UniProtKB/Swiss-Prot annotation:
Record-given protein name: Leukocyte tyrosine kinase receptor
Low complexity biased stretches: 30-40
Membrane topology, record value: Single-pass type I membrane protein
InterPro entries: ALK/LTK-like_GRD, Kinase-like_dom_sf, Prot_kinase_dom, Protein_kinase_ATP_BS, RTK, Ser-Thr/Tyr_kinase_cat_dom, Tyr_kinase_AS, Tyr_kinase_cat_dom
EC number(s) stated in the UniProt entry for this protein: 2.7.10.1
Disorder association: Genetic variations in LTK that cause up-regulation of the PI3K pathway may possibly contribute to susceptibility to abnormal proliferation of self-reactive B-cells and, therefore, to systemic lupus erythematosus (SLE). SLE is a chronic, inflammatory and often febrile multisystemic disorder of connective tissue, thought to represent a failure of the regulatory mechanisms of the autoimmune system.
Positions of transmembrane segments: 425-449
Residue spans of biased composition, Basic and acidic residues class: 241-259
Biological function: Receptor with a tyrosine-protein kinase activity. Following activation by ALKAL1 or ALKAL2 ligands at the cell surface, transduces an extracellular signal into an intracellular response. Ligand-binding to the extracellular domain induces tyrosine kinase activation, leading to activation of the mitogen-activated protein kinase (MAPK) pathway. Phosphorylates almost exclusively at the first tyrosine of the Y-x-x-x-Y-Y motif.
Species of the source: Homo sapiens (Human)
Lineage of the organism: Eukaryota, Metazoa, Chordata, Craniata, Vertebrata
Amino acid sequence: MGCWGQLLVWFGAAGAILCSSPGSQETFLRSSPLPLASPSPRDPKVSAPPSILEPASPLNSPGTEGSWLFSTCGASGRHGPTQTQCDGAYAGTSVVVTVGAAGQLRGVQLWRVPGPGQYLISAYGAAGGKGAKNHLSRAHGVFVSAIFSLGLGESLYILVGQQGEDACPGGSPESQLVCLGESRAVEEHAAMDGSEGVPGSRRWAGGGGGGGGATYVFRVRAGELEPLLVAAGGGGRAYLRPRDRGRTQASPEKLENRSEAPGSGGRGGAAGGGGGWTSRAPSPQAGRSLQEGAEGGQGCSEAWATLGWAAAGGFGGGGGACTAGGGGGGYRGGDASETDNLWADGEDGVSFIHPSSELFLQPLAVTENHGEVEIRRHLNCSHCPLRDCQWQAELQLAECLCPEGMELAVDNVTCMDLHKPPGPLVLMVAVVATSTLSLLMVCGVLILVKQKKWQGLQEMRLPSPELELSKLRTSAIRTAPNPYYCQVGLGPAQSWPLPPGVTEVSPANVTLLRALGHGAFGEVYEGLVIGLPGDSSPLQVAIKTLPELCSPQDELDFLMEALIISKFRHQNIVRCVGLSLRATPRLILLELMSGGDMKSFLRHSRPHLGQPSPLVMRDLLQLAQDIAQGCHYLEENHFIHRDIAARNCLLSCAGPSRVAKIGDFGMARDIYRASYYRRGDRALLPVKWMPPEAFLEGIFTSKTDSWSFGVLLWEIFSLGYMPYPGRTNQEVLDFVVGGGRMDPPRGCPGPVYRIMTQCWQHEPELRPSFASILERLQYCTQDPDVLNSLLPMELGPTPEEEGTSGLGNRSLECLRPPQPQELSPEKLKSWGGSPLGPWLSSGLKPLKSRGLQPQNLWNPTYRS
């Protein structure tokens, strides 16, 4: 190929000739290093000896941190950044690059590897532009990440993709009216012509968004460009929202890992397809390939000539828009519509990972604006005791981390106890002895004083669950009538009708064992019930009660919860054993879930140094499947739970045969209160588990529970951590509305995190149903890579050291139900008890002395 002008450029000791043709865009790069701008004597980063021109990116000093972030340097649109822009953007950081000034690599950033080793390279493609009336969301750019072995001084070429341009605000008054929603000129012209996108009726052309540019990371090998990573750009949105958007799932991200695969460009029509690795642009609207300069395609000429639309593709091969959206750039460019109709979005490009790399994470569409590249050292910590280490820039090595109270030995592997210099032993003994004697004297005086007041203080004790249980057993308190509260113990109680199909339990058949804690209405007890149909043996249950003094609203809420709980019959929803609503005290009897709530169980099961977790990845997947089964049942019965969270899920036991069940319907009950939808009443809204449409507009559908289930998955695989760590509810609201999503928990398998991200789609229609979630969880249980994943080691103190209550011997096996010969009705009668005051007429019997002391077995999920 002939050249009109030739430019000779040298990089160090390696030289090559770059052949450029100003009048043609069909010149391809064969063996050309990055063309540089002329060095400036005022720029300290550039030095130019008489015969050799060095790049402006010297090797990083030994003190440089092992993480580098590359951006668009503030550039946007079709063209890449300049050297001046990148110098300003990277000022004050460890990133030093050389930016191409001309030719096919104009806008490409050159960076040199500071030292040999393995590097984790993460690339983010740019998002596509929004359409004039399709602006609720944009097509996300794709994220890819892999590990590469790089040598000292090796040159990496980095092209950071730029976001495709939006159609609005438009370039003419008429187009601006369309953007504001005050004009339907495009739709009216389409209706009159009857063409809806057929070429020839171009008066209404334009209004689509440009395709997003791809992000490329490549190097030169044997005189040829070799791609390492290509993160595809998102396709541009069309003028109108697609008609079938609500009935189709989002297309999966595409990945290519064959070096010999062709890097072709996307097909297009009036809107251009995305540029590929080696393609040739067939039209001005098509995005240029990397070897053509990777410029974004122009907007179609008809759009500019009529309504002033000019939505170009982003730098990185994004296709220009017309009425349809442009295709996204990539290793292979995304296609654009050939008919240019009103609702044809551009397709995303195809990502690429070199086969010589170690795949770190499957591609995922996450980027909502410009692309970026992050490079960090990949540390090999397999030799460390905790399998964890950190990079020491001064020593240029990975230093192992040791537990608290220990230090690293000289061999950089062994952890040993900290050396504590011995103190003056005699003085220490004297101080301890004196302090002990003084403390004993003070305690003796206090004991003598307190003994005189002990009887009075016993009468003034604050109410507690155990005190309330004692009062129910012995008290005969009578209350005066108050019109604002229901009467307790005065006259006959109002009879409430029972729902059909629910077992009515007489209070005479209920025995209280011990208090579990406080609920939303009153106390919750562990107890025994006899006389159930078809079962003569006593059954352990959890008993919800209504307090002595209650308002009419409390009575209605209690009845509503009873109706909701008794409605469901499923193995993964806590079963309602029976109700007692015809006389006071009102009772709801639930099956006793001895394993406690899921959140506390997960926190207690975290692995610690010297204390492995009793759980494996299959156990976590089983917990998720159990709750998904319950949610699927609710979804099929058109019931919206509104508060799927780990704290509201209970375990039948803590052993291997555990079954997880949904155990709280408080949010579902509260929606029937008139005050529920008042703006600003955030106390009733669990913001961290709710999608944007729920806390912004008060819209609840089955897709609301899908979002909450994604957060529950995050809780399960983080072993009980609070979602959105370190953020307040208001910060979470702003973060989610702004498009932010949580990162995967440490050690979470990629397929499981993909289920979370699908549940967190901004558009409710794009979130999967629970039938689809169950299918994807089943795939995970059949994936050896997922099942063999290890739980991350916890470096902090164990729950016992933190003072939290553990599960004790409950973690070894399920609680066995009482045997009939141990708890026969005759023995229950022999236990006896004193009169129960207001409970006397109902015949409710407490369990007398069995040595049962108050224990913190209360689960907050038992509350409403």
